[in-house]
Amino acid sequence: MTSEQNVFGHVLDILEKLGIPYMIGGSVAAIAYGEPRLTLDMDVVVKMDRDKAKEFSESLGQEYYVNLDSILEAIRSKGHFNIINSEQGIKVDFYILKDEAFDQEEFSRRRKESFDNIREATFASPEDVILKKMEWCKMGESEKHLEDIKGILKISGSKIDLSYIDEWASKIGISDIWNKLKST
């Protein structure tokens, strides 16, 4: 097991222990459904309130750089915060669950998948990972996200609900990116 997996697993164990609903997205989720690649951080969407923020911060202890005020501000603004493992410099980015329709739908579709040889974890669905990565492409950060999408389609393509992606790509304004990907 890599040092990243150890750190990520420890953080996931804390979320589970505290009963904080979460969902892994980003490159870690893309790797779970697609092709392996190097990643040095993990993106996690959380549904966290102020009380849980304090418990979470305290549970991380001295092993992590964590700023409770940053967590509380992220909760207030529906923004994001991060923690960094103080020994290895490994980062976990947390995004507070937003109220937008797509974000709520994505969170409702999360699923348990194997994370490592020790545990299962809650991931965004492969369809939702594809949609989020296309949103990032729309914002200008494209190459690695496009490669992740192609990897998911290559490895998990037969299990992907294409009509769901068609529907949400249209609703969130990324059909042009999706149509280009489907034609390649």
PLM feature spans:
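Compositionally biased terminal segments of proteins
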Residues: 1-184
